[in-house]
Amino acid sequence: MSLIIYTDGASRGNPGRGGYGAILQWGGKEKELSAGYKLTTNNRMELLAVIKALEALTREGLDIQIFTDSEYVVNAVEKGWVFGWEKKNFAGKKNADLWQRFLRLYRKHRIRINWVKGHASNAMNNRCDMLATRAADSGNLLTDEVYEAEYYAQ
């Protein structure tokens, strides 16, 4: 089975309130995911959007195309940076907690991550942006515990 995933992350300030949005499409079906956080960064929300979409899957071994406007996510995976970071135990790298979570999920499937221009003519990316910004602006915000612990420890 093949699956298409569109993702986006948003933050109101960097750091600040943030949110992610994801849309999964398969076999004529569609599922939307989103959530907002009290204090986070845009890159954490971009990566968390991908993670939450992959965590929503109930099967392994899928062919997945992910579309995101995050050069951070695309380059880290498609240029192989994240695998080098992993070999060095993510020493000095931001968002190590999320990258480790991502890699556990990534290895369960055949995934290709594609870049799309944000805030442009890609209707699905625009929908994900709407989901992410609505979540960031909602009154029901979650705590990004790892980020907040690091932020307040500074």
Show where each model-derived region lies.
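RNase H catalytic domain
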Residues: 7-17, 51-127, 131, 140, ...
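RNase H-like nuclease fold core
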Residues: 1-44, 48, 54-62, 134, ...
